[in-house]
């Protein structure tokens, strides 16, 4: 067998160098792919975290809308010139008013005429501050009846026939806090609750407490 000539050695070196260059290029490609994969991985993780937080927030919001009772978030403070009684606020709106005038007076204050239970409790509360006469107060109308009114006396409230004009006592629910108002408005917007639900519910709770 003939020994390799110098020309053959040069060819072999070139081939070996070319192979080494090819190996180095493959390693460089792998490193470049690994470097570009990290940003995509981080971006995917960030999007996944954001979506998870969005799902959790949506779940909590829906749970609060469907299951949370916002009655526990009421402020408990009646507006100025209103008297707090149970879950309701009351105010004397005027005197010598007809039925239509009484309804209009309460509507101007975003309220309604006082109901019988609150009227009875209010009269019993002011009796100790009345005079010794059999009758010391003005007759005022009730929400529950168009023909029967309440007359405060030292012995307590009594029912009388409504005259043409009476005093006007208005009633409205205690105000809600900001968070409770947002929940209530959302329920009303989604038609999960009637607009007058809070007023009716607060009146029921107030009457239950006073009985």
UniProtKB/Swiss-Prot annotation:
Q: Which residues are glycosylated?
A: 96, 133
Any idea which UniProt keywords this protein has?
Answer: Glycoprotein, Membrane, Signal-anchor, Transmembrane, Transmembrane helix, Viral envelope protein, Virion
Q: Which InterPro entries match?
A: CTDL_fold (IPR016187)
Q: Name one GO cellular component term.
A: membrane
Topology check: give the Virion surface ranges. Answer: 68-211
- The main location is virion
Q: Where are the transmembrane segments?
A: 47-67
> How the protein sits in the membrane?
Single-pass type II membrane protein
Identify the residue ranges that face the Intravirion compartment according to the record: 1-46
Q: Please state where this protein is localized.
A: Virion membrane
Question: Belongs to which family?
Answer: Belongs to the herpesviridae HHV-1 UL45 family.
Q: What is this protein called?
A: Envelope protein UL45 homolog
Tell me which species this is from. Answer: Gallid herpesvirus 2 (strain Chicken/Md5/ATCC VR-987) (GaHV-2)
- Please state the gene responsible for encoding this protein: UL45H
């Amino acid at each position: 067998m003939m020994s390799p000539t110098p020309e053959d050695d040069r060819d072999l070196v070139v081939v070996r160098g070319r192979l080494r260059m090819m190996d180095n290029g493959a390693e460089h490609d792998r490193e470049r792919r690994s470097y570009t994969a990290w940003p995509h991985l981080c971006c995917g993780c960030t999007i996944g975290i954001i979506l998870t937080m969005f799902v959790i927030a949506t779940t909590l919001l829906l749970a609060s809308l469907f299951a949370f009772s916002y009655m526990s978030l009421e402020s408990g403070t009646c507006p100025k010139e209103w008297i707090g009684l149970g879950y309701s606020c009351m105010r004397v709106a005027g005197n010598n008013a007809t039925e239509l005038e009484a309804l209009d007076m309460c509507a101007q204050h975003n309220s309604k005429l006082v109901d019988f239970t609150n009227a009875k409790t209010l009269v019993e509360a002011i009796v100790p501050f009345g005079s010794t006469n059999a009758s010391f107060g003005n007759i005022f109308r009730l929400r529950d009846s168009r023909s029967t009114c309440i007359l405060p006396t030292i012995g307590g409230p009594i029912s009388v026939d409504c005259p043409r004009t009476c005093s006007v006592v208005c009633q409205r629910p205690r105000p809600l806090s900001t968070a409770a108002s947002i929940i209530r408005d959302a329920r009303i917007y989604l038609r999960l609750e009637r607009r007058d639900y809070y007023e009716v519910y607060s009146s029921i709770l107030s009457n239950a407490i006073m009985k």
